[in-house]
Amino acid sequence: MAAAAKPNNLSLVVHGPGDLRLENYPIPEPGPNEVLLRMHSVGICGSDVHYWEYGRIGNFIVKKPMVLGHEASGTVEKVGSSVKHLKPGDRVAIEPGAPRENDEFCKMGRYNLSPSIFFCATPPDDGNLCRFYKHNAAFCYKLPDNVTFEEGALIEPLSVGIHACRRGGVTLGHKVLVCGAGPIGMVTLLVAKAMGAAQVVVTDLSATRLSKAKEIGADLVLQISKESPQEIARKVEGQLGCKPEVTIECTGAEASIQAGIYATRSGGNLVLVGLGSEMTTVPLLHAAIREVDIKGVFRYCNTWPVAISMLASKSVNVKPLVTHRFPLEKALEAFETFKKGLGLKIMLKCDPSDQNP
């Protein structure tokens, strides 16, 4: 009788700008506080594609081969000796950012700001676009039976929306402007509505994406063409009948940030989620004299439990965001599809024995 084939650890590895390869890596052994995961679903993020195209994002530079992927879920294969809350067979969602030390930011509960944090697929740390991956067990969260692996993977972008809405103070009855109808704009829309926003208006250049935003719950949409930032602000006010209390900017485009400042109600909050140029010209005086608070967002913290509750209770529905699925073996084709701007969220299926959502 032939011996069973040894499982491989096919991994998607970026070696430098434009150099993306599928390679077989050793299956890692979990440490005492880690779990080994059989990966199931991993979403492609814009940052993954940026590392592939340019080999860097700001000061994060790919200096050695790095496995991509950080929007992920999988099944526990093996647990470390000190892990008590998980067991083999558990389905989990992975929070990609795990602090390495209990520094001042961790003590404040803002561990996302820790300069030494481990973060999947951020140099020099490997990600989880692979068959098998080990991770800090404290940052692996059990999925309820009614939450799919793909929903578990989408908790990562959903967490950005949760953190952004928290930073903006979105609450019952608010009018909210979301700039950008990409994946992050879409999850921000979903979270704002779930948190009680009375009306959410979404802006974008793409009529197709705005149609999707309308489909998943946007009250109003505004397609941008050649309007000035001031004109965009006036159109938003015209649609809502007032200025929004909260604007969440998800594009990073200079003109969109400018429009966000002009559009936000006096005393309101502008939250910057999208990453653009390091130096940006904005009408700060216009924000200052109207006490528009400008807040930054860097990833997220303390969001996975609430995201799981939102998904399990059906308070949000992220399933319509997935437009393409590829097996891990076709990862290069999947990345080319993303690069062409096709679809919204592309999901890679890492377990050859289970390609279901």
Swiss-Prot record:
Domain of life where this protein originates: Eukaryota
Residues found modified as Phosphoserine: S211, S225
Stimuli inducing this protein: Up-regulated by androgens and down-regulated by castration.
Gene Ontology BP, a term: flagellated sperm motility
Binding residues annotated for substrate, in chain numbering: Y51, E156, R299, Y300
Tissue: Expressed in liver. Expressed in kidney and epithelial cells of both benign and malignant prostate tissue. Expressed in epididymis (at protein level).
Residue list for modification N-acetylalanine: A2
InterPro entries assigned: ADH-like_C (IPR013149), ADH-like_N (IPR013154), ADH_Zn_CS (IPR002328), GroES-like_sf (IPR011032), NAD(P)-bd_dom_sf (IPR036291), PKS_ER (IPR020843), SDH-like (IPR045306)
Cellular localisation: Mitochondrion membrane; Cell projection, Cilium, Flagellum
Protein name as it appears in the record: Sorbitol dehydrogenase
